Regions:
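Extracellular/periplasm-exposed beta-strand and loop segments of Gram-negative cell-envelope proteins
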Residues: 1-11, 39-78, 105-146, 173-190
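Short glycine/proline- and aromatic-enriched beta-strand/turn motifs that initiate or cap beta-hairpins
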Residues: 1-21, 96, 142, 170, ...
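Hydrophobic, lipid-facing positions within transmembrane beta-strands of outer-membrane proteins
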Residues: 12-18, 80-84, 147-151, 189-193
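Outer-membrane beta-barrel strand-turn architecture
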Residues: 22-26, 88-92, 157-159, 199
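Repeated loop/turn-to-beta-strand initiation elements of outer-membrane beta-barrel proteins
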Residues: 27-30, 93-96, 159-165
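Transmembrane beta-barrel strands of outer-membrane/channel proteins
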Residues: 34-38, 98-104, 165-169, 197
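Outer-membrane beta-barrel transmembrane strands
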Residues: 74-89, 142-148, 152-154, 163-166
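Outer-membrane beta-barrel "beta-signal"
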Residues: 155-161, 187-199
C-alpha cells in the first residue's frame, strides 16, 4: 500500500492537433479531430508491502516480493488521440463540450527505482532482505489503447484565437488487467490549459 505521496510533479506537456466543428442547431454541435499529445509525471512515494519486481543495481539479480521503503517513478507517454465531443454554445464567445476520447500510445515510459528499504521474498511474510537501490522499467508492459471521457470549455478571446480548458479522465488503466507488478489500476487523469487558432 502507498503510505505517503512525498512528491508529485506533473511535467509540462505539449498538445498539437486539428479539430473540426459541425453545427447541428443554433446551440448544439459536434467537434472531432486528431491530436498529438504527451503526458508525464514524476512521483516520490513511501510504500509498505508493495508488490515489486526490480533489478538490484549492485548486479545481484532480480528481486521479487513485498517492498517496504521509497519509490521514485518517472512516466512519459506520447499519444495520438481522437475525441468525439458534443458542444453547446453559451452565447457568441463561450462553448462547453463533453464526450469520449480514444487514444493510441505510440511511445511510453514507466520506470523508476526502489530505494532505502527492504523486500520480503514473494509475500509480506517471506524472508527479509535489505535493498539500497533497485531499478524497474515497465515501459514494455504499458497498455497501448486508452479511452475515457473529456469535458471542458472554450472562450473565444479574439476572432481567430480561443482559450480552452479541458479535463481528461481515463476509464481503463495504463497497464493490462493481468499485469502483476502493479497490483492496482492506475488511471490517466489530466487537465489541459491551452490556446487554439480558429480558421
Amino acid at each position: 500500500s502507498i503510505r505517503s505521496l512525498d512528491a508529485y510533479r506533473p511535467t509540462l506537456s505539449v498538445m498539437l492537433g486539428l479539430g473540426v466543428y459541425k453545427p447541428l442547431t443554433d446551440k448544439w454541435g459536434l467537434t472531432t479531430g486528431l491530436r498529438l499529445e504527451n503526458k508525464g509525471m514524476d512521483i516520490d512515494a513511501t510504500v509498505k508491502n508493495y508488490h515489486m519486481e526490480a533489478v538490484n543495481e549492485d548486479g545481484s539479480g532480480k528481486v521479487v516480493g513485498a517492498w517496504t521503503g521509497g519509490v521514485r517513478t518517472k512516466v512519459r507517454n506520447n499519444y495520438l488521440t481522437f475525441p468525439i465531443l458534443a458542444t453547446y454554445s453559451l452565447g457568441k464567445r463561450w462553448q462547453v463540450s463533453a464526450g469520449p476520447y480514444f487514444s493510441w500510445m505510440f511511445d511510453g515510459e514507466f520506470s523508476g527505482e526502489a530505494h532505502d528499504g527492504y523486500i520480503r521474498d514473494t509475500d509480506p511474510t517471506g524472508t527479509k532482505a535489505e535493498v539500497s537501490r533497485a531499478i524497474y522499467d515497465f515501459s514494455s508492459d504499458l497498455r497501448r489503447f486508452h479511452w475515457g471521457l473529456q469535458a471542458g470549455g472554450e472562450f473565444r478571446a479574439y476572432k481567430h484565437l480561443s482559450v480552452m480548458l479541458n479535463l481528461q479522465w481515463g476509464l481503463n488503466g495504463i497497464f493490462p488487467s493481468d499485469f502483476e507488478s502493479v497490483t492496482f489500476d492506475l488511471y490517466p487523469i489530466y487537465a489541459t490549459l491551452g490556446f487554439s487558432y480558429v480558421f
